[in-house]
Structures are given as C-alpha cells and as structure tokens.
Design a protein with these regions (language model features):
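Extracytoplasmic/secreted proteins, especially bacterial periplasmic and envelope-associated proteins
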Residues: 57-60, 71, 75-78, 101-105, ...
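Structural microenvironment flanking redox-active thiols in thiol-disulfide oxidoreductases
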Residues: 82-144
Length: 228
C-alpha cells in the first residue's frame, strides 16, 4: 500500500486541508474501530525502540518547515501530557532529502543542550509566523545566537559526532518505519499511523491510543509464564 501523507510527503510538499474531531480519543477509536491496512500499518520488520523496559514507545516524525507539523505540534504536546505512565513519547526529525538535514541537526542540538522544551515551539514560530529562513547551518546558528546560544557553541555541537550520530539514527528510524510523509507516528516499533491512514491528525492520536493498548496486551501476553 502506497502511503501519501496528509501534509508533507517525500514525493510532494504540497499542503492539504484536514478536519477536526469532537469525540473523545478512546471513544472515537473504539466507536469507529481501527483496521490494520486502513487506519494503521503493521511494520513487517520491527523498528528499534529506545523506551525503558516495560514501556511502550510512541515516536512523532516531523519536519520544522512542514506547516501541518506546525499545526499538529500543539495536539501532540497536549496528548503527551495526558498519556499513560507506561508510554514513552519522543520526537524524531525526518530528512527525506539532504536539504532537510540542517533542521534535523537543529533539533538534536537543542536536545543536547536540554533546550527542546524552551525552543522547539519557537523554531516553528520563527518559520511559520515570523517567516524566517532557517534552511542552512549559518541561518540556524544566527537564529540560535539570538536565543542565547552562542553561534560558535551551536556550530560546534551542530557538527559534533554526537549530533551526527543522532541524525543518522533518526534517518535510519524513519526508513525502518517507511515514513514518506509528516507528521506521522510510530508505535512501539510495530505500527505506523498518519493522516493518510487515520484521515485527520486528531484521529491519528486516537488510533495511536488504540495501538498502545494493542501493544500493552501483547507485552502482557509475552510476560506470562511459558512465553518468550
């Protein structure tokens, strides 16, 4: 099944409109049902996860320049604040082309400095509200300098082995999930959902709740005596 993202895809960066949902997350997921192959996809070869033992991982794939990622970010952020304690959520920036890499590295520099909470939303705002160009290392470093991160320090981290490794692993994870558009969600290395499957960004989180429960049940079954 070919996936075409509701927002920005690797094949096309055209924008598309999306609707809203008024039903509670679990209620709508259960009411409409979630079907493999339509509402979500099962990954043939499980993708690697970084969640602590016993936790279920949810990965948000995004790109700072994507307008729909900008719109989805508050939804995902609100969702993470209400997620169950056995769920571990993280973000990973995609790089469909080489020119995506500067913003991919930007995220990991912020992560290395412990400034994601402070500056992640400000990056989106700079691009989509202030219309700043943050496409190259120099442009991004100049912006970071205005946020209190000295340009030299930013570029040192930007070009560091640590950030290079994180960027490479991020792209590998993107490929493992066969992500071809953003925003999208990977669940516990086994499932993938997005606007294409779920039809709206809100419902992609509803489907994610359903897949978390599926993962929880599978983990519980594996933990029973005699299972391996």
């Amino acid at each position: 099944m070919q996936r075409r993202e509701f927002s920005v895809s690797a094949a096309s960066l055209a924008a598309a409109a999306f609707g809203a949902s008024a039903l509670p997350i679990r209620a709508q997921a259960q009411a409409k049902g979630c079907q493999n192959g339509s509402d979500y996809l099962t990954i043939a070869k499980p993708a690697p996860t970084e969640a602590p033992a016993g936790q279920i991982e949810v990965v948000e794939f995004f790109w700072y320049n994507c307008p729909h990622c900008n719109a989805f970010e508050p939804m995902f952020d609100a969702w993470t604040k209400k997620m169950p304690k056995d769920v571990h959520a993280r973000r990973t920036p995609v790089a469909f082309r080489p020119d995506f890499e500067p913003q991919q590295r930007l995220y990991f520099v912020l992560e290395s400095l412990g400034k994601v909470d402070e500056l992640h939303k400000k990056v989106f705002n700079a691009i989509h509200v202030e219309r700043q160009q943050l496409a190259t290392a120099d442009q991004i470093a100049a912006w970071a300098d205005k946020q209190g991160i000295p340009k030299a320090k930013f570029l040192e981290l930007y070009n560091s082995f640590s950030v290079s490794t994180k960027a490479r692993k991020s792209t590998q994870l993107q490929d493992a999930y066969a992500v071809d558009g953003v925003p999208a969600l990977g669940i516990n290395g086994r499932y993938f959902t997005s606007g294409t499957q779920a039809k709206t960004p809100e419902r992609s989180l509803q489907v994610t709740d359903y897949l978390i429960e599926q993962s929880r049940q599978a983990m519980s079954a594996m933990a029973k005596p005699g299972k391996s």
